[in-house]
A protein has these predicted regions:
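Stable alpha-helical elements in mature extracytoplasmic
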Residues: 1, 15-19, 77-80, 84, ...
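Second-shell loop/turn segments in exported
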Residues: 1-10, 65-74, 95-96, 112-122
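Export/targeting segments at the very N-terminus of extracytoplasmic proteins
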Residues: 1-28
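Short acidic/histidine-centered micro-motifs embedded in hydrophobic/aromatic stretches
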Residues: 21-25, 36, 113
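Peptidoglycan-targeting cell-wall enzymes and recognition modules
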Residues: 27-101
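Active-site or metal-binding loop neighborhoods of secreted/extracellular toxin and effector enzymes
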Residues: 98-139
Length: 139
């Protein structure tokens, strides 16, 4: 997932860590996870599915429509990553996530409007853990 977001232009360690922390909180990076923790296919879930637990009808069905249109499975990591970065919720914050030099708390503020979580949980702690583990390389 890190490589994918870097390829999308997100280079800042704290921005990447915030994205990873949110995905870990939502799904533990398990693409075929349904709300509540069961592992199942997209069509067997209904709502609250995947990497960021797409819950609202438009976002959940948007994942399925995207997969059908582009020939992927809505239950796989590559399809979900591609869908995630095409959603309007992501597009609204994408430029801010690409802007370097912000704190995790600031990036987390942006991420809320992207994911709209009901429970904050450990996402900020996870983000700090990732920030401590990520290595940035100047090229």
């Amino acid at each position: 997932a890190v490589d994918y977001f870097q390829e999308q232009g997100i280079k800042d360690r704290n921005a990447l860590a915030t994205i990873l922390g949110n995905i870990k909180q939502e799904s533990m990076f398990v693409p075929n996870i349904c709300e509540g923790g069961s592992r199942t296919s997209y069509h067997s879930c209904g709502r609250g599915y995947g990497l960021i637990q797409w819950t609202s009808a438009d976002r959940y069905y948007g994942l399925g429509d995207f997969a059908k249109k582009f020939g992927g499975s809505p239950s796989t990591l590559p399809t979900q990553l591609r869908y995630l970065t095409t959603e309007v919720q992501w597009k609204r914050i994408e430029d801010r996530m690409k802007t370097p030099g912000k704190s995790i708390d600031r990036y987390m503020d942006y991420a809320y409007s992207w994911i709209g979580w009901g429970i904050h949980g450990a996402r900020t702690s996870y983000a700090h853990e990732y920030a401590n583990r990520l290595i940035t390389v100047e090229v």
